[in-house]
Amino acid sequence: MERFRPLLNKVAMGTALNRDEAAYAFDKMMSGETTPSQMGALLMGLRVRGETVDEIVGAVSVMRAKMLTVDAPVGSVDVVGTGGDASGSYNISTCASFIVAGAGVPVAKHGNRALSSKSGAADVLAALGVRIDLAPAAISRCIAETGIGFMFAPTHHPAMKNVGPTRVELGTRTIFNLLGPLSNPAGVKRQMVGVFAKAWLSPLAEVLKALGSERAWVVHGSDGLDEITISGTTDVASLEDGRVHTFEISPEDVGLTRAAPEALRGGDAEHNAAALRAVLEGAPGAYRDVAVMNAGAALLISGRAASLRDGVDMAKASIDSGAAKAKLDQLARATQALAPQVDA
């Protein structure tokens, strides 16, 4: 711990940590070797100054090293958000995940229960009859057999229990809100990550580049959504061929109609489960349109689609053919069957 105090002093002076220093600090915190005061001081010092790319890379590398991993096919994708956008939207990325899987791209979905919203990915999946408490080996089998699997964050990141109480006591956003979406237990190399603030677009794309991602989009809607929105434009930082570039997209680009922000709002887990099921069963409207736009982007990132419009067309076909709904049914059945294999 002799090295930790000097790092605290560095942060207190407003000086950035290098990648190795950040990794050391987060290893000590996640191993339970720091006091709550030390942990809180470091987290708030980083938050006030603003976390750097190297600090996030160092922290994520530790989180990934400590996680319980899952095997997934090469080419698997994840569609995930940081949360914290206060939008109250329905579970867009979860719905999009079934659409992507229905289009033939394996999905290794990583998520949690609601932290700042009424319904997180885990909550809505449980309401849809999906068991979220599978052991890593069972999830690997689930993805292999059905083309989609859900990894419940607390199961795969046991070291987080050492920082959880301090995060709750702080009661404000910290670097850990960024680390979860960047720490997929299946090690996917292609992902779409939604963020709660536009300022994080390019930095998180650079983090993904440093951590070995092949292709990724980091997105933020003009309405504040940590997804691609259809109520306005969406800013994108795209990682492709080792380069990050930024651009803006709109629903009109792919033939979709804008909707009011209220049209994307959801409710509790039961409400959102019914909405998600309705979309997969072919119901028209804003819920469908925002899901197919997000799924279309994921299909582009995966390499299955040649353009965003092509991806949106594939996403629509995934729903209209019944393939997306079939993935939900397959996931529910597979997780129920595999549930007895859960570790005691």
Swiss-Prot record:
Keyword Amino-acid biosynthesis: yes
InterPro entries found in the cross-reference section: Anthranilate_Pribosyl_Tfrase (IPR005940), Glycosyl_Trfase_fam3 (IPR000312), Glycosyl_Trfase_fam3_N_dom (IPR017459), Glycosyl_Trfase_fam3_N_dom_sf (IPR036320), Nuc_phospho_transferase (IPR035902)
Phylogenetic lineage: Bacteria, Pseudomonadati, Pseudomonadota, Alphaproteobacteria, Hyphomicrobiales
Keyword check for Glycosyltransferase: yes
Co-factor: note: Binds 2 magnesium ions per monomer.
Binding site for 5-phospho-alpha-D-ribose 1-diphosphate: 81, 84-85, 89, 91-94, 109-117, 121
Pfam families, sorted: Glycos_trans_3N (PF02885), Glycos_transf_3 (PF00591)
Subunit structure as annotated in this protein's UniProt entry: Homodimer.
GO molecular function: anthranilate phosphoribosyltransferase activity; magnesium ion binding
SUPFAM superfamilies given in the database record: Nucleoside phosphorylase/phosphoribosyltransferase catalytic domain, Nucleoside phosphorylase/phosphoribosyltransferase N-terminal domain
Pathway as given in its UniProt record: Amino-acid biosynthesis; L-tryptophan biosynthesis; L-tryptophan from chorismate: step 2/5
Binding site for anthranilate 1: 81, 112
Reported cofactor(s): Mg(2+)
Species whose genome carries this gene: Azorhizobium caulinodans (strain ATCC 43989 / DSM 5975 / JCM 20966 / LMG 6465 / NBRC 14845 / NCIMB 13405 / ORS 571)
Record protein name field: Anthranilate phosphoribosyltransferase
Binding site for anthranilate 2: 167
